[in-house]
Regions:
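Glycine-rich beta-strand-centered segment in the early N-terminal region that forms part
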Residues: 1-9, 14-52
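NAD(P)H dinucleotide-binding glycine-rich loop of Rossmann-like/cofactor-binding domains
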Residues: 29-34, 43-109
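Short, glycine/polar-rich helix-capping loops at beta-to-alpha or helix-loop-helix junctions
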Residues: 53-54, 133-144, 205-212
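Mid-domain Rossmann-like dinucleotide-binding core that forms the NAD(H)/NADP(H) cofactor-binding site
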Residues: 78-157
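N-terminal Rossmann-fold cofactor-binding loop
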Residues: 132-136, 170, 226
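N-terminal Rossmann-like NAD(P) cofactor-binding module of classical short-chain dehydrogenase/reductase
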Residues: 165-168, 194
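Glycine-rich phosphate-binding loop and adjacent beta-alpha segment
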Residues: 174-248, 282-283
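C-terminal hydrophobic helical "lid"/dimerization subdomain
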Residues: 231-283
């Protein structure tokens, strides 16, 4: 019914993602999608990497399916799931103790995933949400933030930000180092740094730049969040709640549905770059 084409799918198609490093042709780079059971008419979310989904039909193990509400829009769910799940899974499965009552910083808050993260963190009970980005105008338009900080070299946080508990980083690169060095940490608590994305893919990784003494000077926990970070049990537990959440929230970006038959034409198009591409069955 619908398959999203987020950045990770594009990276897999180009063999620039770890999950596709050993791929051989023919290769289907899809991650997940929405399917229709032709025998019952029921809609299902298909769990990540359960089957190749750039196809008219797919044979899926029932354990990899999450039933959706009959009124769910397949295109909407397919467009949102990757962007929303990145912060949902990070805050529910990676952040120790979750984000309830805590301060969450989103580095790269103007990205599609960053915008979704603000909505997710609020729904999961974060007490304060701070967004960081280089662009003042687009940062001002991000909904759900309590405070906004412009990313400027040397990438330091103002003292007015106060103590932080969780830092979700969608950018990576040198900015994270300056932010961790200048971040305040509440006594008795850890600052949990979770790298979720790598928008600064051309820059050196923060672990290459991080002064080793910093993790001795501050109680900092450094971790990643991605497909290899979660167990099958994590996914089965979280997906029903995530799907229910996705069907109710406001979409924070434009969606571009296109027929599967036009995949070559739309893959690198301007619409696919500015909007969130979702492939649907050809008529």
């Amino acid at each position: 019914m619908a398959v999203g084409v987020p950045r990770v799918v594009q990276a897999r198609a180009a063999c620039k993602h770890p999950s596709a490093s050993n791929a051989s042709l023919p290769f289907d780079p899809s991650i997940d999608g929405i399917g229709l059971d032709e025998s019952t008419g029921e809609l299902y979310y298909i769990n990540p990497l359960s089957a190749p989904l750039f196809a008219e039909r797919a044979n899926i193990n029932q354990s990899q399916l999450v039933r959706l509400d009959p009124e769910a829009d397949p295109v909407r769910v397919a467009a949102l799931v990757n962007f929303v799940s990145s912060s949902w899974m990070a805050l529910k499965c990676r952040a120790i103790g979750g984000c309830q009552g805590r301060t969450v910083v989103i580095v790269g808050a103007t990205s599609a995933s960053g915008r979704a993260a603000a909505i997710v963190a609020r729904s999961l009970g974060a007490a304060r949400i701070i967004g960081l980005s280089r662009n003042e105008d687009t940062l001002a338009a991000v909904e759900g933030l309590d405070d906004r900080v412009l990313l400027r070299e040397p990438f330091t946080l103002p003292e007015s930000v106060g103590p932080l508990h969780i830092m979700l980083d969608y950018v990576g690169g040198p900015a994270a180092v300056g932010l961790l060095q200048s971040a305040q940490v509440e006594p008795g608590e850890n600052l949990q740094y979770i790298q979720v994305g790598g928008l600064a893919s051309d820059a050196a990784h923060m672990l290459q730049l991080l002064p080793t003494h910093l993790i001795n000077l501050k109680p900092i926990c450094i971790m990643g969040s991605g497909m290899g970070s979660f167990t099958k049990q994590d996914l089965r537990r979280e997906m029903p709640g995530l799907m229910s959440f996705i069907t109710k929230i406001k979409v924070p970006f434009e969606i571009y549905p296109a027929p599967m038959a036009d995949v070559q034409a739309v893959w690198g198009s301007e619409n696919a770059t500015k909007k969130r591409l979702v492939l649907v069955p050809s008529l």
